[in-house]
Design a protein with these regions (language model features):
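Charged structural interfaces that engage phosphate-rich ligands
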Residues: 1-220
Length: 220
C-alpha cells in the first residue's frame, strides 16, 4: 500500500488538501449472512474457472461449507445455541469466506461509486486491477486499498461529499456497517499515514488498546 501511495504522489495526484480515509467493517466475521456468503463462494469459484478444487466438485464444496458455517453450536448458561448469522471467530474458513464475501461487496460498491480508470487495489486476495465504472467521483478518488475488512482511500473532494459516499456505502448491505476515520493523518493497520503539504509520510503505528498485551522487543 505504501508503494502505491508513493507512486500516487510521484504522479502528482496527491495535493496538500488530499484527505485520507480509513474504515473497517464492524464485526464482519460474526455478521456474515450465511446463505448469501455461500452463494458468493460458489460465484467466486465459477468466475475463477473452478468446477472442482483438488478433485472436489463445487457442489460438494458448498455442502461442506454449509455444514461448517451453519452447524456452529455453543453453550451459555446451561442452554445450547446455534449460530444463525456469521461464522465462528478464529476459524480459518470464516476468514476465507469473509474475504470472498468482501470481494463481492466491494465489486458492488466500486461499480456504484468509484471513478473510471482509477487504481483499485486489493490486498486481501493479492490482486491489483483496473475498473471501468461510473465517472461520478472521477476527480475525487485517488485509489482504494483493502486488507480483508480494513480499507484505505484517498479523497480530493470535500469532507461532506466523502461522508455522503460512506453513508451510502453503509446502506449498501444491512449486515455491513463501516466505522470511519478521516483526516490528513490516519492509521491503517500498523502504519500511520500523513499528508504533509502534499508529501506522504509514514511511520509505525501501535494501537493503544493493544499496547498492554504486547511483549517489549528486548524481552526474553
Amino acid at each position: 500500500m505504501i508503494r502505491r501511495l508513493q507512486q500516487y504522489q510521484n504522479e502528482g495526484r496527491l495535493s496538500s488538501t488530499t484527505l485520507f480515509c480509513t474504515f473497517d467493517i464492524t464485526d464482519l466475521y460474526t455478521m456474515l449472512p450465511q446463505e448469501e456468503s455461500l452463494d458468493v463462494l460458489i460465484e467466486f469459484l465459477l468466475q475463477h474457472g473452478y468446477q472442482k478444487v483438488k478433485g472436489i466438485p463445487i457442489d460438494a464444496i458448498r455442502t461442506l461449507a454449509n455444514i461448517v458455517i451453519k452447524e456452529n453450536v455453543f453453550a451459555y448458561e446451561k442452554k445450547f445455541y446455534r449460530q444463525i448469522v456469521g461464522g465462528a471467530m478464529g476459524s480459518a474458513f470464516t476468514l476465507t469466506l469473509a474475504n470472498i464475501f468482501m470481494w463481492k461487496w466491494e465489486q458492488r460498491l466500486v461499480q456504484r461509486l468509484l471513478p473510471s480508470n482509477e487504481i483499485y487495489g486489493r490486498s486481501g486476495l493479492l490482486e491489483i486491477h483496473r475498473k471501468h465504472i461510473s465517472k461520478l467521483f472521477s476527480s475525487l478518488f485517488g485509489f482504494v486499498f483493502r486488507y480483508i475488512d480494513d480499507i484505505f482511500l484517498t479523497w480530493n473532494g470535500s469532507i461532506d461529499s466523502l461522508h455522503q459516499m460512506l453513508n451510502e456505502a453503509n446502506g449498501h448491505h444491512t449486515n455491513i456497517k463501516l466505522v470511519r476515520q478521516i483526516g490528513q493523518t490516519v492509521p491503517f493497520l500498523d502504519v500511520l499515514v500523513e499528508n504533509q503539504h502534499g508529501l506522504v509520510l509514514t511511520k509505525v503505528y501501535h494501537k493503544s488498546a493493544a499496547e498492554p498485551y504486547i511483549a517489549p522487543f528486548p524481552s526474553d
